[in-house]
Amino acid sequence: MALALPVGMAFGAIASGWLSDRVFHSNRSRVISLFLFLAAACSVAMYFLPRDHWLGVPMLLLTGFFTYGPQSAFWALCPDLLGRARAGTGTGVMNTFAYVFAGLGEPLIGWVIESNGETSLVFAIVAAACLTGSIISPFIRR
């Protein structure tokens, strides 16, 4: 079960990049919004899925696929929005914010889980974050 999430993440990144370029004609916000919406749906399903249910592994794979998939579209936004001359700086700024919020978010998520004693709450938190991103991402413009 532990491998399902990262395997899904790896394939999601490839699929998201390809869909962004080929199907959505480099409209990054569409693939980001779609994948994050589907990630929210998968995370909600994981939250309600009973422990050791046979759908746990495939659902976790899909959760990783749709949660991490938008990463490739995020990084492609840097040259799209900032041009080649500033793409490296833009990527660095995006990485900085990603790691700062990850660093701040992990203790908060850990506290919520520890306070409630329910590890599945991580999926509810991920679902809320993904749904928020899905709603906001269509406003990204080139």
What are these regions (language model features)?
Residues F37-R51:
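C-terminal ends and interior cores of transmembrane alpha-helices
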Residues M46-Y47, A124-R142:
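Multi-pass alpha-helical transporter architecture, strongest
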Residues H53-G69:
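Hydrophobic core of transmembrane alpha-helices in multi-pass small-molecule transporters
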Residues A13-S26, I113-E114:
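Helix-to-loop junctions at the C-terminal end of transmembrane segments
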Residues N27, I109-A129:
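A membrane-interface helix-boundary motif in multi-pass transporters
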Residues R22-L36:
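Cytoplasmic membrane-interface "Motif A"-like loop-to-helix N-cap segments
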Residues Y68-L82:
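Intracellular juxtamembrane helix-capping segments at the cytosolic ends
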Residues P79-E118:
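A late C-terminal transmembrane helix in Major Facilitator Superfamily
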